[in-house]
Amino acid sequence: MADPVLLHSRTVQQPRATINKLHILFHLTAILLLLYYRTTTLFYENNVPTLSWSLVTVSELFMAFIWFLGQGFRWLPISRSVFPEKSPSDVRLPGIDVFVCTADSKKEPTVEVMNTVISALALDYPPEKLSVYLSDDGGSFITLYAIKEAHEFAKSWIPFCRKYGIKTRCPEAYFSLLAEDERLLWSDLFKVEEENIKSKYEIFKKNVENVGAKDENNCPRMDRPPCVEILHDNREDEENKIPMLVYVSRERRPSYPHRFKAGALNALLRVSGIISNAPYLLVLDCDMYCNDPTSARQAMCFHLDPRMSRSLAFVQYPQIFYNVSKNDIYDSQARTTYTTKWQGMDGLRGPLLSGTGFYLKRNALFGSPNQEDKYLLHPEKNFGNSTKLIASLKSNHNIQDASIKDENSSVSILEDAKLLASCAYEANTNWGKEIGFSYECMLESTFTGYLLHCKGWTSVYLYPKRPCFMGCTTVDMKDAMVQLMKWSSELIKLGLSKFSPLTYGVSRMSILQSMCYGCFTLQPLLSVALLLYAIVPQLCLINGTALYPKVSSPWFGVFSVVFLSSLCQHLYEILSTGATFMTFWNEQRMWFIKSVSGSLFGCLDAIMKRIGIQKANLRLTNKAVDKEKLEKYEKGIFNFQGAAMFTVPLIILVILNLVCFFGGLRRVILENNIEVMFGQVFLSSFHLLLSYPILQGLIPSKRKRN
């Protein structure tokens, strides 16, 4: 039997992998020595400040534990390449259903959402095998109006992109500076057609913005029936085919749980199951447009590889943001995650599901590898009582041709689709439990991906040179902190639940993979350790109480090695990914600032939910662009407007460190004991350096008020 065509390659990152392992051994040795010093001094030395020493020791112990869990990311980092030119012919390619989710047209600009939809329609994939579904959880008039307008514009835009091989197929991005190179050196005919297309886009954009300007058209409807409309079903315009386009607004009733994004995705799973029933799904956030039309073909290089496709659940792409400033003062690009951690997990069982930009096997949501039919033994109990949905699950082929042959069958399918999008359909079924996206955690994609790995599925991570998906990130402290608080709260909830990676996960996946998940879920608790580390040594400094060895002591060298080793490892990862020292410093200070603010409030939020003081609610990040915020962000000025709650612990720590630093320094000079107190003087000064952006962000705003 001939060997299968090589569709992709896998390379271990060397010398990075070897350096990482050597550093783990070195750093672990230093940490063990440090903890040995702490514990022996506490139990065997006299005149030790027991409470302060114990608090600092516990902080260092927990930081060491989180560091140890994080080494799973560094054990086997790999890179992947794909060869889409070797992929099967269009006839043999499987179908793909694209899911785009939006919830609030006020916080998620409608034109931006439509650009994402249009870019998905324009993917370089056989149009008869591609279907795009928009989930509108707000049920607002403007979204339905806009998608109809987008459909009309797409009839001109998609043929134009195909004719000239346009790569940037999001119209807003194409007509901006992001795609300026694509518009050079073209013929006069191209320029004429481009101007015509641009004119149509401006008309489309203006129409949507004019309708959206009326508040009543933007108001989400929280009590409404389901609405499903097939805007394009591939039966017309054979010459310039465009993919199927479907609008879905699931039913909302105050008496039924909402289930947020997970509920929307499960509704799309059911509705698409009786309309197109593609074996693979692409899930996109409403602001994450398709930047490379070949992303689907690249993903199929893995899904169609017979050596791995049996157990492969999804292909994850990184989230790349087009509006990240040069300095990236808020660490919005999440460089560590997408250039270090995900590549490390890819060397194990694969990265976790990141919420957007992933190609997922539909059957993976319905069972374990080689046991996808398990839940079909009792289909009504698991999937509900829709005969069409159950039939689609049992079939191994795309049922689109059988579903929409004539107007009567189309009407019948729409009625069934509305039933599947109703609130009551999931009652007494396993949707959100063992079927579909999980309702256990509001980080629905992350938790669902975790469960997939626990069931035996694998995933891969692809970081191509040209970003396949691009989106808009937060440009002020408030939105960054609100987002972090939501993530931290849900991660802590997961880390301390019965599904904890260190208990539930470790028995179902490799130890290293469990360590990675454990690091993610427990990392928000670092906020407590860092808070203690930013308070206790400083108070002891001003009181003249030493918590660290003398500079002349060999044990001081151990503390220095741990500190410098950690910084050097971070700096090495920064430089090896092509970033600069400024990126290193920004990540250091934002790690501290976010930990003692957003993550800290996330922990408090999780506690309040646990004891019933606060209910779970969806906190949408505002994706509407504020020019003033954007200007400050691009200039590298921290903007704390609207983030008063998050700045309280930061300001308290800054004031405490200032008082303790200068008060302690005065005492050190008077008592001439710098050798004894140097560790705390240095620690306090380092905290002040990390906290400088807080003063930098607050002082200009005061000047502006004056």
Residue ranges: model-predicted function:
Residues 1-459, 469-474, 481, 485-706:
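Glycosyltransferases that elongate glycans
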